[in-house]
Design a protein with these regions (language model features):
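Bacterial Sec-dependent N-terminal signal peptides
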Residues: 1-24
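Signature for phosphate-centric chemistry
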Residues: 22-147, 153-326, 330-431
Length: 431
């Protein structure tokens, strides 16, 4: 029952475009898992879709998705806090709560040992479920022996995410024809690197903004007092800020692996502490991957090649009698800027005051949970071959708004308007 209520809360959060600071703090106090940001286990979508205009049916689906739930990427993310607590334990300055946390961290390290960054069983399940819902929601796209063209970055968790979706689709329709690949050849659009934008993202302005916000808003003393008996020891031997962030990351990642059934670290934090740590993480994502003025205001254009590829692939496939499906699997660092480049749900905002992000409804949790995905679903009217092709975009399987002229049905946009607007936007960016 508790698990059921948790997912209901996640669904309510995901569907909301403007969550006030107070309401989100209240949600965290009841369901601390929501503070996990990009470590949030994929929320089950509401299942509600607006009917297409009369006579229109889905004919093609294009997609970019993040890998599913994983372990933390680096062994050091587990070992660094373990070593801090072990040294304190040897010095006899750990509290009972500190000793309990150390035991839990050792269990988490053992579970993740030599699996750092790998897909968890829950991550595999998430992609199976996403593929099943794709098939059930848009059966006309997957009919007969259409082609499913799938590409992944050359990272194993992404490749396995792709394979789990493909296997699920084949289970529903064994006649599907599959092409799947993971090659450095495609990284120019699958996982584009951009030196200019990276330099702006890693600038001192971004770092100073985050550091100064943390000094003003995050008080680590209460947490340290719950872990350590000796204030002087903490002052001399512990990087309280680093330890706080490490423990927050570990508390957040628990929900993504099987160990979630046996332990939690959220009781270590107060709701206020979780909210502040979430705010910091949310600001980090905004400053580095959205249109933050502190990082130049152009970070979403890191996905310009991906969006061009989505458009050209769609035009090519839509010219075929049976367009099929195009799937792409990568990372949150692509999904986030692509979401902002598209301005889904008014996500492409520019604010100098990062304290206002939550009040303005900007939430990275809503955009990049584990297995985050953007689906472009294309509709045609078979009785009117010359009628406009329509497109609908789903963010994490929920209908999203676009900054385009409206049609007769909410969330459905003319493909011609889509191309005109976004190709013009892409042309406005000068490398």
């Amino acid at each position: 029952m508790k698990k059921h209520l948790f997912w209901l809360c996640v669904l309510a959060f995901s569907a909301s475009l403007h969550v006030t600071a107070q309401s989100f703090k209240q949600q965290i106090s009841v369901h601390p898992e929501l503070s996990a940001n990009n470590y949030l286990a994929y929320p089950t979508p509401s299942g509600k879709l607006t009917p297409a205009p009369s006579g229109y049916f889905p004919v093609y689906l294009s997609h970019y998705g993040r890998h599913g739930s994983r372990y933390l990427i680096h062994a050091q993310q587990y070992l660094r806090p373990i070593e801090v607590l072990e040294r304190a334990d040897s010095a006899g300055v750990l509290t009972n709560e500190g000793e309990d946390v150390l035991k839990k961290l050792r269990l988490m390290y053992a579970e993740s040992y030599k699996r750092w960054g790998e897909l968890t069983p829950l991550g595999a399940q998430q992609h199976q479920q996403i593929a099943r819902r794709m098939y059930e929601r848009f059966p006309s796209v997957f009919r007969d022996s259409v082609w499913v063209d799938a590409k992944s970055t050359d990272v194993i968790r992404c490749i396995l995410s792709m394979e789990n979706e493909l296997q699920e689709l084949i289970r529903h329709n064994p006649r599907l024809r599959i092409r799947h690949d993971a090659s450095a050849h495609d990284m120019y659009f699958m996982n584009q690197s951009d030196k200019k934008l990276s330099h702006q993202r890693d600038s001192s302005a971004v770092k100073n903004t985050i550091d100064e916000w943390g000094k003003r808003n995050i008080d680590t003393k209460p947490l340290m007092a719950r872990l350590f008996k000796d204030k002087e020891y903490v002052a001399k031997k512990v990087d309280a800020g680093q330890l706080s962030f490490d423990l927050f990351s570990l508390a957040s990642i628990v929900q993504n692996s099987e160990i979630r059934h046996s332990l939690s670290l959220y009781n270590l934090f107060t709701p206020e502490e979780l909210y502040r740590l979430w705010e910091r993480s949310n600001a980090w994502w905004y400053l580095r991957y959205a249109s933050a003025p502190q990082s130049g205001g152009n970070q979403p254009f890191s996905q310009r090649n991906l969006l061009r590829k989505i458009i050209t692939d769609a035009d090519s496939c839509l010219a075929l009698p049976h367009p099929g499906v195009t799937l792409r699997f990568g990372h949150d660092t692509m999904v986030m800027p692509l979401t902002c480049l598209l301005n889904l749900n008014n996500s492409d905002i520019r604010v100098s005051d990062i304290d206002s992000l939550d009040l303005k409804g900007w939430s990275s949790t809503r955009i990049v949970p584990m297995a985050a995905n953007i689906q472009f679903v294309f509709y045609k009217n078979p009785r009117k071959p010359k009628a406009e092709t329509l497109v609908k975009v789903l963010l994490n399987e929920e209908e999203a708004t676009l900054p385009l002229p409206k049609t007769s049905a909410p969330y459905y946009y003319k493909w011609s308007d889509f191309k005109k607007f976004y190709l013009s936007k892409l042309s406005s960016y000068h490398e």
